[in-house]
Amino acid sequence: MYKYGTVVDPAMTTNRRSRLSGFRCASTARVTATLLLSFLAFSPSSASSDFGDRFHDDIVLPPGPVLPSAPEIPEPAEHTFSLRHIYHHGTHLHPSLHRKRDVVHEQSRVYLAAEDDFSEYDILRLKAKSRPEPIHRLADRRPSVVDPMVAESRQRGYAAVLDASAWTMDQVSSPDIKDKDTVLTLALMTANAYVEHDTDADWEDVGERWNRSADFGWESDGLRGHVFVDDTNSTIVIGLKGTTTAVFDGEGTTTNDKVNDNLFFSCCCAQQGQWTWHQVCDCATGTYSCNNTCVVQALREENRYYGAARELYSNVTELYPDAQVWLTGHSLGGAVTSMLGMTYGLPVVTFEAVPEALPASRLGLPVPPGASAEYPQMRENTGTFHFGHTADPVYIGTCNGATASCTYGGYAMESTCHAGYECVYDVVADKGWRVGIGTHRIRSVIDDVIKKYDGVPECKRTPECRDCAQWKMYESNGTETTTTSSPSTTSTTRTRTRTSTCETPGWWGCLDKTTPVTTTTSTTSSSTSTCKTPGWFGCKDKTTSESSTTTTTEASPTTTCETPGRFWGCRDEVEATTTAKPGQVTNVPVTAAPTGTTDDSLSTALPETQRCLARNWFGICKEWAIDDLEFATDEM
């Protein structure tokens, strides 16, 4: 490159330009920064804020954990289920027992057992539809996290209070309760839970090793659950065994079911009710006064069905960790599945379930912020649906009267409120049914209700329902078995002083000798004799005359009745008598004095008298005869 006759190296020129360019850029940046800071010092605060936002946007944060994205809303789908496993968990006699038996469809026959008028029903493959349902539940629902929380609530006596961040509102794949076939399928799964022997396959231990020498009778104690799985292993249904209704104890799980029923669904352990109720604790301290702390302690023992159901669910989820779980049950099994669903946030469909809001309030179940732990029926988005009809006294909460079948069997069913939604078939109005315990059976619900209706009923919540309104529930410190609670009242004691003591009391008074009593009245009377022969209603002595202004003296008759009547009256001949009244003079006939000689002509004729010839049935004379009385002077 030439400049004014001088040769210049192009590389040197390029380097110089680069240095000058870098110098100019650096100087310009410093000047611009100085002017910008001066401008911001005199600008409004909003400008400073905008600068701060731009400044933070330029900061590069270090890499952190990847936050989970919002779960996708499940699409409606159709599932085909088959029975895969049967679980059995001990409760009372064998609390550590937990066994499982697999069902092989090529070798096993799955059926509903015959019941009364219903024959056996084979179950091959069951179809059901699903739909998304919002459920407010814990974000971390693993049994290893939830179970210690529930155990702590059981020890403290109240539900755990969790932050709102621990809860989430999820769209969960749930049974389509508006589809009749889906409801029928779940009912069949519930009915199948009553079948105890499907195959002759051996049971395998799930929990600790079971002593084979004590193998006799274990099937009569515990909770039975049947597990249905769809073809893709993505959805499973657990059907829990309900109450085996019986009047007297002894067969199967009847005794244990009765104890759990009366713990769960009575106001105060079946006390102060009907004399046939099976009492299961002693927590009542007065008339309709109950120590709720005592009831809670009796209800939360781990050898009850609720604890067994949680452990059964834990083992099933270990076998299918990624599957969506549905719960179903009938009667007591339906109530237990509802409480299990509220614990882990699972979809639940029950049939003729006993109202379970009362025991749910005593178990210390986790509740979301803003919900009432005392009234679970007020919770929203629980994902629980209770199907039943109006002719079932257990479902509608009226099986507690003196003549009710539940009372006759020893069951105290006093609860009336369901948590979640109620789907009621009004068979009383639609079909003219009468309320009776016979309609409570699941086979009757399947064949006579669900299959007979063209659709399904509308499901509604009942948040205004209340249990045990007449009872006064109070809490104690839990150190005593029972506590007596009496309100402070002011009472007035009346004292009566007696001036005499009765030595011989009678039925209606005192039998002692009477004493003269003086009163302030103007008339004074006194008795001149005492009672020597007291009787039941008075004195048997002859009455004495009392002084008065008019004295009347009556002469006692000198004759007695020789011929009494059949029932009353006297049949003797009537003699004429004359009664002299005061102030009246009666002329008495006077006869001449007798002389020494006797003459028949001196006989005096007396007045005529009447004589009864015939009398009637009551002794009254019907026919009279008149006779002349004659007498001789020598008779005088």
From Swiss-Prot:
Family: Belongs to the AB hydrolase superfamily. Lipase family.
Its EC number(s): 3.1.1.3
Subunit-structure text: Binds to both phosphatidylinositol (PI) and phosphatidylinositol 3,5-bisphosphate (PIP2).
Name this protein carries in UniProt: Putative lipase ATG15
Species of provenance: Gibberella zeae (strain ATCC MYA-4620 / CBS 123657 / FGSC 9075 / NRRL 31084 / PH-1)
Top-level taxon of origin: Eukaryota
Positions annotated with a glycan in the UniProt record: 211, 233, 291, 315, 477
Gene3D superfamilies with a match to the protein in the record: alpha/beta hydrolase
Keyword Isomerase (UniProt): no
Protein localization: Endosome, Multivesicular body membrane; Prevacuolar compartment membrane
A UniProt-annotated Pfam family: Lipase_3
Keyword Lipid metabolism: yes
Keywords, sorted A to Z: Autophagy, Endosome, Glycoprotein, Hydrolase, Lipid degradation, Lipid metabolism, Membrane, Signal-anchor, Transmembrane, Transmembrane helix
Example GO biological process: multivesicular body membrane disassembly
Lineage of origin: Eukaryota, Fungi, Dikarya, Ascomycota, Pezizomycotina
Topology class, membrane: Single-pass type II membrane protein
Name of encoding gene: ATG15
InterPro entries hit by this protein: AB_hydrolase_fold, ATG15_Lipase, Fungal_lipase-type
